């Protein structure tokens, strides 16, 4: 035991007497990698190493002092710089071409929240479709990603996921002969909506020109089922033009809904190039006018996409015509190309321009206008305002027909 102790003492004393060489430095304290200059071994005052290239700057990174003091890297951008579009060369060697990158104000997070997954599961379980998914809406993570279902907004797409028309901006599937209607869809839709404890819901549909009534009776039946399950529910219907059959428009308008929406999509001059040839700007105006005539208290709504190459005068003309048929609400959003098969984007409109057109629409007498790069016709920002207007009207006793009266109107129209 004594021998072992003496041996340990010898090794310890030997280690302490190892001569220091130029390649070995005694460690007096624990060190960490920082962005601050470290003191030299000789004790001479340290100087910050000059950043010579991008790699040095990236490796060093900003210190806390850099953030506090601001500096040239934190100087706010001018609007012209912030809204400047950037380009990139893409493609294989020898065949590269210049493409405009998506502006920063159009980028949205990938949907992955628990509420998004739960909402999606409910829809799949009842064999329902949403325009949020079919049209690849950029707001899906925002509208579906609320902390609870009451904060979520989903636009239910009726009559299947296949359209009989082929608009050049739309990513929904097309076919001349889509599958037949699901007779259980109105009941399933009402059931799904009743589960979510929503106060406001949007119903839309594909165009079904293969049906004699364009699906108007199916639409009306869905509204009636929803109102029967929850009379307090506010319902917005975004419909097609029913090939100009105004009786079908009036049928849906009298079904008990609260907001009748039909989108003109673009200005009149560009309509033949943007929409299916069976749709015209004047026909859409007649649809909106017929809905208002069927129920004067009904809020009517439409939407336009910007970025197709429209001019200011064309937009002014579109707004004047919409006001002339009593449209109450208009929305503006940026056209975003779904695939290479669709129309290219002519222009990315800046947020400042969207705000300008919002003010112009309000000055013209529209009840409400939602305008922004990511705004879509059923975006929840507009619905919150419309919901408050409808509740005030209902409290004042001017909300329109009851569910019973609406059912009678539908029965009469469908004889």
From Swiss-Prot:
Residues 33-47 have a biased composition (Low complexity). Residues 1-32 form a transit peptide. Pathway: Protein modification; protein lipoylation via endogenous pathway; protein N(6)-(lipoyl)lysine from octanoyl-[acyl-carrier-protein]: step 2/2. Its main location: mitochondrion. Keywords: 4Fe-4S, Iron, Iron-sulfur, Metal-binding, Mitochondrion, S-adenosyl-L-methionine, Transferase, Transit peptide. It is found in: Mitochondrion. Its cofactor is [4Fe-4S] cluster. Its EC number is 2.8.1.8. Binds 2 [4Fe-4S] clusters per subunit. One cluster is coordinated with 3 cysteines and an exchangeable S-adenosyl-L-methionine. InterPro entries: Aldolase_TIM, Elp3/MiaA/NifB-like_rSAM, LIAS_N, Lipoyl_synth, rSAM. It is an enzyme of class 2 (transferase). [4Fe-4S] cluster 2 binds at residues 163, 167, 170. CDD domains: Radical_SAM (cd01335). It holds the Pfam family LIAS_N. SMART domains: Elp3 (SM00729). One of its GO terms (molecular function) is metal ion binding. Residues 20-53, 395-415 are annotated as: Disordered. Belongs to the radical SAM superfamily. Lipoyl synthase family. This is Lipoyl synthase, mitochondrial. It comes from Aspergillus flavus (strain ATCC 200026 / FGSC A1120 / IAM 13836 / NRRL 3357 / JCM 12722 / SRRC 167).
């Amino acid at each position: 035991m004594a021998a072992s102790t003496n041996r340990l003492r010898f090794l310890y004393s030997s280690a302490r007497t190892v001569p220091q060489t130029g390649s070995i430095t005694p460690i007096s304290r624990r060190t960490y990698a920082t962005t601050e200059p470290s003191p030299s071994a000789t004790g001479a005052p340290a100087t910050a190493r000059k950043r010579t290239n991008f790699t040095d700057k990236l490796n060093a990174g900003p210190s806390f002092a850099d953030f506090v003091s601001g500096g040239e890297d934190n100087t706010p951008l001018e609007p012209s710089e912030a809204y400047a579009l950037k380009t990139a060369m893409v493609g294989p060697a020898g065949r590269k071409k210049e493409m405009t990158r998506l502006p920063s104000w159009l980028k949205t997070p990938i949907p992955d929240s628990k509420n998004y997954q739960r909402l999606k599961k409910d829809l799949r379980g009842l064999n329902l479709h949403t325009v949020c998914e079919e049209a690849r809406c950029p707001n899906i993570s925002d509208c579906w990603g609320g902390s609870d279902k009451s904060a979520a907004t989903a636009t239910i797409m009726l009559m299947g996921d296949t359209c009989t028309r082929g608009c050049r901006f739309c990513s929904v599937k097309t076919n001349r002969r889509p599958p037949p209607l699901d007779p259980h869809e109105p009941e399933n839709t009402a059931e799904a909506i009743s589960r979510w404890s929503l106060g406001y819901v949007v119903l839309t549909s594909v165009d079904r020109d293969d049906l004699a009534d364009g699906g108007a009776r199916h639409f009306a039946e869905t509204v009636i089922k929803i109102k029967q399950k929850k009379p307090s529910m506010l319902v917005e219907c975004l419909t097609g033009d029913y090939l100009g059959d105004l009786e079908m428009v009036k049928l849906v308008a009298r079904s008990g809904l609260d907001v009748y929406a039909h989108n003109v999509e673009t200005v009149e001059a560009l309509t033949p190039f943007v929409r299916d040839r069976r749709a015209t700007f004047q026909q859409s105006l007649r649809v909106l006018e017929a809905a208002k005539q069927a129920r004067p208290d009904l809020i009517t709504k439409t939407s336009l996409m910007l970025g197709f190459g429209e001019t200011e005068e064309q937009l002014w003309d579109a707004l004047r015509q919409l006001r002339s048929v009593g449209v109450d609400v208009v929305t503006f959003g940026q056209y975003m190309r779904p695939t290479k098969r669709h129309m290219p984007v002519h222009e990315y409109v800046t947020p400042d321009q969207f705000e300008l057109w919002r003010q112009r629409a309000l000055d013209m007498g529209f009840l409400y206008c939602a305008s922004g790069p990511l705004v879509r016709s059923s975006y929840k920002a507009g619905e919150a305002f419309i919901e408050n207007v409808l509740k005030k009207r209902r409290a004042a006793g001017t909300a329109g027909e009851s569910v019973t009266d609406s059912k009678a109107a539908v029965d009469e129209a469908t004889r």
